[in-house]
């Protein structure tokens, strides 16, 4: 599903002395099956922005279009129910939302709540377990007996059971160890590639942005400051640092190597890109000495 924000402004407690404008005139587009990363320091408006996508918050002014759905300040909650079946939200620490007695029941809750027959919802829950990399031995276990990483997979399976076409991820790897973070990001990449989901990712992990995102939106004090490819956004380290951000670690390391005389055809953003460039450098040096 394609997404378009058109001059979106959002003010908390509008019309009161406590009014605070968290988004100002944000416009951006994400193509169908696109992968957008949203970055920015704490308080920049990232979470407020993504909560507009299934109208947990509705814009104070402006319009959001998600395929045939349109969200405006006047959109009614009744009109939003079909949209919310298509937009899946994974918040920070989603395992805190688990509540059913068994893993299978927890995953099946959403589909049943939207009218799916119990038997179909339970069968779908088993399918989603496999999708997130858990076997059927987990189905009848209490979700509260699982490890933190397993609980998070169950929570994500519950979102996927709604069969969304857009998956919105708010710091989905927060609190995970490096291996768990990599496994989670690979899962989302597989869903993006194999199921054609449109992904919107909020993260502080610049390595994940460089590795997976096709577009990057930089938020600062509620405004969209930059929008482009990872290569575009990470091309100016000084500008990023002015906005309390930095380039990925591979780019930082490449800069140190460049200071020592190595050259790169273009800025490496991932460890794989850096390794490839270094291998080419060593191969060329070897050929020059033959």
UniProtKB/Swiss-Prot annotation:
Enzyme Commission number(s) of this protein: 7.-.-.-
Subcellular location: Cell membrane
Gene3D superfamilies: P-loop containing nucleotide triphosphate hydrolases
Residue ranges annotated for the ABC transporter domain, each copy included: 3-246
Function recorded in the entry: ATP-binding (A) component of a common energy-coupling factor (ECF) ABC-transporter complex. Unlike classic ABC transporters this ECF transporter provides the energy necessary to transport a number of different substrates.
Quaternary structure and interacting proteins, as annotated: Forms a stable energy-coupling factor (ECF) transporter complex composed of 2 membrane-embedded substrate-binding proteins (S component), 2 ATP-binding proteins (A component) and 2 transmembrane proteins (T component).
Protein name: Energy-coupling factor transporter ATP-binding protein EcfA2
Source species: Levilactobacillus brevis (strain ATCC 367 / BCRC 12310 / CIP 105137 / JCM 1170 / LMG 11437 / NCIMB 947 / NCTC 947)
Taxon lineage: Bacteria, Bacillati, Bacillota, Bacilli, Lactobacillales
């Amino acid at each position: 599903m394609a997404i378009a924000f058109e001059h979106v402004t959002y003010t908390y407690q509008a019309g009161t002395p406590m009014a605070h404008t968290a988004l100002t005139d944000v416009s951006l587009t994400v193509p169908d099956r696109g992968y957008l990363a949203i970055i920015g320091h704490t308080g920049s408006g990232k979470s407020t922005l993504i909560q507009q996508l299934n109208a947990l918050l509705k814009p104070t002014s402006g319009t959001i279009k998600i395929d045939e759905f349109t969200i405006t300040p006047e959109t009614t909650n009744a009109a939003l129910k079909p949209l919310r079946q298509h937009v899946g939200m994974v918040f920070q620490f989603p395992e805190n939302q688990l509540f059913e007695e068994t893993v299978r029941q927890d995953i099946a809750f959403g589909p049943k709540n939207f009218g799916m027959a119990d038997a179909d919802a339970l069968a779908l829950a088993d399918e989603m377990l496999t999708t997130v990399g858990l076997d059927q031995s987990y189905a009848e276990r209490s979700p509260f007996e699982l490890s933190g990483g397993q609980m998070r997979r169950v929570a994500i399976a519950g979102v996927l059971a709604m069969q969304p076409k857009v998956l919105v991820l708010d710091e989905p790897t927060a609190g995970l160890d490096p291996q768990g973070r990599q496994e989670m990001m690979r899962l989302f990449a597989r869903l993006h590639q194999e199921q054609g989901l449109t992904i919107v990712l909020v993260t502080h992990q610049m390595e994940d942005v460089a590795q997976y995102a096709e577009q990057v939106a930089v938020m600062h004090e509620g405004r969209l400051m930059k929008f482009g490819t990872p290569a575009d956004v990470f091309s100016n380290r000084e500008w990023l640092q002015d906005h309390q951000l930095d380039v990925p670690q591979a780019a930082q390391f490449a800069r140190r190597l460049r200071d020592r005389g190595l050259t790169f055809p273009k800025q490496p953003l991932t460890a794989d890109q850096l390794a490839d460039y270094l291998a080419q450098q060593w191969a060329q040096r070897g050929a020059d000495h033959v």
